[in-house]
Amino acid sequence: MDNLFSHSDDALPGPVDPVESLEPVICTVTVPGPVAQAFAGFTDHTHLWWPLDSQGVYGPGSYVEFEENLIVETADDGRTAVWGSIDDWQPPLSFHASWHPGTTAIWSTELRVAFRAVEAGTELRLFHNGWEGAEDPAATRAAYAVGWPTVLDRFVRFMGGAAQD
């Protein structure tokens, strides 16, 4: 008897796919003011605070906006890049989008941003996952783990809050 167990080795689970083991990037910040104001600041006035110099496709001088069911960056020469497609829009509480700035929808990840009232104003919780959709899942996740805090710090300051540590 080669095996003490009643099942064969073929029935054992295989190795875990490294992409499936990548954790979501979750960031939470608090801004002063009511939920509706925070939602509008994030979605209607993105062009005023988004750090396009470091977190954009075309860099300074471009313009980012939520346009119908898309998130779009427009360069000063008129070129456009679709950052994502919104598939769940629940103002002023949340939105969900496929997310692919600088690449195509084929390589998209998943982004959900939710807003809720807290004693100090509004809490924004960003949940970014779906790394298996990215061309290079581990590198994409690592870049967003660094990038989202920078982006959200700019949003907090735009909304009148103190810079996050």
Go through the PLM ranges and name each one:
Residues 1-26:
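Short acidic N-proximal helix/loop "leader" segments that mark the beginning
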Residues 2-10, 130-165:
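A conserved amphipathic terminal alpha-helix motif
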Residues 2-4, 63, 76-120, 129-132:
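Hydrophobic-ligand binding "helix-grip"
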Residues 26-27, 44-83, 94:
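Short beta-edge strand/loop motif at the mouth of beta-sheet-based domains
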Residues 29, 126-129:
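Short, hydrophobic/aromatic-enriched beta-strand segments in well-ordered soluble domains
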Residues 32-49:
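Amphipathic alpha-helical segments
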Residues 38-42, 71, 86, 95-97, ...:
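Hydrophobic pocket/interface hotspot
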Residues 43-46, 109, 122:
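Ser/Thr-centric signal marking residues that sit
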